[in-house]
Amino acid sequence: MYVATNDYIYKTRDAGRTWTNLSQGMSYSRVIAMAIDPVYPATVYAGTKGDAVYKSHDGGQRWTSMRSGLDDVTITSVVNQFLFDPADAQHIFLATTMGVFETKNGGEQWTKKMKGMKEVLMVVTLGMDPARPSILYAGTSGGVYKSTDQAGHWEKMNNGLVPPDMLKTSRALNVTAILVDPYEPDTVYAASLAGLYKSTDGATSWKRIGESLADQMIIAMVLDRTRRGVIYITGRDGVHRSEDAGATWKLINSGLATTNIRTIAQSATDPKLFYAGTNGSGLYRSKDAGETWESMPMVGGKS
């Protein structure tokens, strides 16, 4: 498992008992996003703030800059997310504050893919229809965009997300996460800094859900891949879980020393195992689908 902090990338091979600092070949830029090649797990990608993309072929031991086509990166530019084409691990989409980029050769060359995104200032997140991978969704500072041709062209899909008088603005709605239901491909969830939304018609229209949540600033979201209708969201109020597709919510913070949760992830091998990254209080793990959490101190490792 890899963990990116404000300072370094860490890796554990023993479920968090010991950690190794992985930084050889990287700048001191903050790592914002990481991704593991689904075919060759020793190949790892890191997206940074200010220094574009790095790639490692040996499990993070050595890193190489992969910024060809990302040359307009500035010190404030952020790589937010990697998204793999399930049919080709060399084909990757990138969500950045400069827009959407695509590579077809594992990061050797990146191409900007922003046709139709006229008002967008930044792209925060990308989602893919698992049943129809040519369909992509982009969560941006201006709301949601959809592509039906693998980012060849984008169309704004903000009906119900924001008031009509704000539909054309570049900061209509800051979307932080967008996910497609693996059981119902036309059902899409969009988390934002102003609440949670759901579409049942492929983003043609949206409805607000989760209005009972005390804090409407949603930072991260996960759809349980093995349990239909189960959603996890995080923010300044901790972790919430819904077991009825967003109709009702349960706060699941037992064991957390802080409620400011910045990210959440479900294990690829154990569906009951979840990880939560906090803002300044380290990493937590749950072995019971979020009912209880335990701290995972990053100590006992080596550089």
Task: Give the location of each predicted region.
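Extracellular glycan-interacting surfaces
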Residues: 1-303
